[in-house]
Amino acid sequence: MHPPAYDLPEELALPLASGAPYWYWLGGRPALDFVNTRRERWRRQVETLVTGADLGRWLVQAGVASPPAPRVPRDLLDEARELREAIDAAVTAILEDRPAPRGAVVLIDHWLDHAAPRPHLALTDGGVPVLGERAPAAAAQRALGAIALDAATMLGSERERARIRICASDTCSARFYDRSPAGRRRWCSMTACGNVAKARRHRARQA
C-alpha cells in the first residue's frame, strides 16, 4: 500500500537530499504518478527523483519493478527525467488543446522498445533461421518502458485522453486520471486539495 500524500512545507530545504518522503500516488496510473515526481510545477519545481536510488525505490513502489530496487546509474536517472518531462509535455499539450510535441512523442516511442520482450531472428550454426527473443533490458529500463507503455496507451486513445486532468488547486500541479463516473473530478484528492479549497470558500463567505 502506498503512503499518503504529503504537503510540502514552505520551509522545505531545497534541493532535497532524497525525494522519497514526498512522493504521492494520486495520478491514477503509473505514467501520471511518474510525472508527479516533479512537485509544485507552478511554483518551486521540487525534484523528488534526486538520486538513482530514489528512482529505483520509486519504480518498486509504483509497481512497475520487482524488489529489490533496481540499480540506476546517473545517466539513466537523467534519461528517466527526460522521459517524465516528455510525458508531461504531451499531457499539457492535450489539456491546452495544442498539438503534442513531436520530440516528446518520439522519446516516449523510443522507450516502448524496453516495454516487452522483442522478437529476434537469428541463424543457427547450420544456417537455419530461428525466431527467439532479444536479451531483456536491465530491470530499471524495463520499468521505464512499462511507464512509457502506460503513457502511450493513455495518450493514444481519444477516450483516455479525455480523462486526463490537472488539479484545480492554485498551489498543486498534480496530474491525474479521472475515473469518476461523471468525468467531472477537479481535485487530485478531495481529502487534500478539495477540502482546502472548500475551507477557503467557507472562510471567504464568513468574512
Regions found by a protein language model. Give the residues of each.
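Short helix-coil boundary/hinge micro-motifs
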Residues: 1-166, 173
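BZIP DNA-binding basic region
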Residues: 143-207
